[in-house]
Amino acid sequence: MEPASLENLSVLYQSTNYIVVNKHWDIRIDSKMWYEKQTVQSQLKHHFPELADPGTYYGFRFCHQLDFSTSGALCVALNKAAAGQAYRCFKDRRVTKAYLALVRGTVTEENLSLDFAIGKNTTEGKTHMMCTEGTEGCENPKPCQTEVTVLEYGTYDGDQVTKVLLQPLTGRTHQLRVHCSAIGHPIVGDYTYSLRTDNSPYRMMLHAYFLHIPLHNEPIHVTAPDPFVPSLDAKWAPLRCVNILEDLLKNILTKLQAAMQEEAEPEPRTSSPVESEEQRAQCQQWLCEWSLE
């Protein structure tokens, strides 16, 4: 339960093109604020100064985002070409992610498919939040899908909670937090979506457990060790196991292997869909990652 520091950076995978780190909770990926000394970017610069790219504002290109409060697998590209390849995988929704969470209450159904559309909350005092379609002040809601699988029932600090595996099939901001809150089972320690009431846990209990990026020459799949175990947090007391995490991971990997084999089979050549100017601009902005120019 030690807080983040420059020294405690955990590397899950490293090559000449990518580094995947196990992001600590309560740390920003990057920041332009002078007072934000502890960021993943500063950790990377501290441990790998020779890998920083002087042509970018932060020195490193993050392939995706994790919230300040979320821990787990975070992929970093070490050059522009690698960033471009990763971008295509995310853009085409070919990346597979799975998260672990402790949520409030007892999730009675073992498997759930959530499809609440999510938009930006424009209500005064809540503009930093997202919300489900139909909420007053919900702007530009977009379709979102999350698969929920119950792992264990137990208690956290004496309160009923459920440990779940969350698989986002889309990538909307705060998607998992909003979806869990929408079904009446907010994530333990989610200060924002509990409207500042759930403030006793030392962290928000959301962890990016599994990440698979199907890069052509360097497919990446990593797991970030489960932090929600009694040996690491004595306040978490599992009482009944419903699904074994390792078995669910095997099922995910089996599906991935089948999908990869299907992709490897030759198909009739068809013209590639034309990328719009907006998509091309988004790609260039993402690749530049706040260029110094």
Swiss-Prot record:
GO terms for biological process: enzyme-directed rRNA pseudouridine synthesis. Pfam families: PseudoU_synth_2. The active site is at D67. InterPro entries: PsdUridine_synth_cat_dom_sf (IPR020103), PsdUridine_synth_RsuA/RluA (IPR006145), RluA_PseudoU_synthase (IPR050188). GO terms for molecular function: pseudouridine synthase activity; RNA binding. It comes from the Eukaryota. Belongs to the pseudouridine synthase RluA family. This is RNA pseudouridylate synthase domain-containing protein 1. It comes from Danio rerio (Zebrafish).
